[in-house]
Amino acid sequence: SDLRMDFNKQNDLKVTLFFSIINGKTLGPFPDWIGKPSLGSISEDNLIKALDAILIRYDIIDTVIIAGDTEEYFRYSEQNIPVYKELFDGVYGPLKEKHPDVKFGNAFSLHGVINKNLSHIVEQLDVGDFIAFSYFPVDSLNEINKTPQEAGEDLETIMKLVPDKKKGIFEISWSTSEFVNGTEVEQTEFVKKVYDFYRTNQPQLEFVTWYRQFDRPEGTCVMTPEKTEGQISIGGSSDLGSNEFVIERLNHYICNSGLIDTNGNKKPAWNEFTKQVQMSKNS
């Protein structure tokens, strides 16, 4: 971590810290000294001390995401939203006082919010300095089911979901895997849509980050079904919607969502990405 942070500092780069009190369906993972507490028993003091120590050590951190894929955790436990809001507020106040230039917020999966109709959870957790969103143009089975134009329209829903607070785009992507209906042409077109969205809404955006620069070898991107808790199923004897089916597609999606392939060849979207960066610098 120190080497990476030193590299970022030498190149005058700022860093977003993803702390993950909540990480999708689960709490944590936490360091051993925290153990495995329930949401209501997480110590505010311990979290404040841990985050304070990190922010003092790495002064290039300018944003902190306390929870990620937050809508998934509260999907079946909305009664715990007030508990989390109290925890967040209790941590936010002292840290903001000591580190006034650091922004604190939570992240949501925009495609999860849209696919599962969970916008009300985002609205109830409108806390902190910003609300961040990740985005894959996929259905609940992790197959691409949007055109770049439709995906661009999905991004516009962020402005309606969070009208009065800064927004962040955290880990946005488009896979080129044919296995999940991806193509290089559509990835390139989506890069254009992302920059159109950025330029139109720049005053309201805290940050925008692409999910992955480089592809990874197939099968190395997510947990295996055996290590995944719970079961995703549509019922009956069909394998459609099973853990294995969904995770297989997520593997293919993530491993091929980079802008440069595993052989080091630049995809057309990489050239478009660099062109758009240059256009933004010159505008």
Which sequence ranges carry the predicted segments?
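Substrate-binding cleft and catalytic face of glycoside hydrolase catalytic domains
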Residues: D2-N80, L87-K103, S109-H111
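Active-site clefts of carbohydrate-active enzymes
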Residues: N23-P29, F133-D139, I158-V194, W210-Q231, ...
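Acidic (Asp/Glu)-rich catalytic clusters
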Residues: D2-T16, A53-D59, H120-V127, T157-P163, ...
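Aromatic-rich peripheral "rim/lid" segments of glycoside hydrolase catalytic domains that contact
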Residues: F179-V180, V185, T200, Q204-L205, ...
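The substrate-binding groove and active-site-proximal loops of carbohydrate-active enzymes
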Residues: D32-E44, D69-P82, F136-P148, N181-V185, ...
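Short, acidic/polar
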Residues: S43-L55, V113-Q124, T188-F197
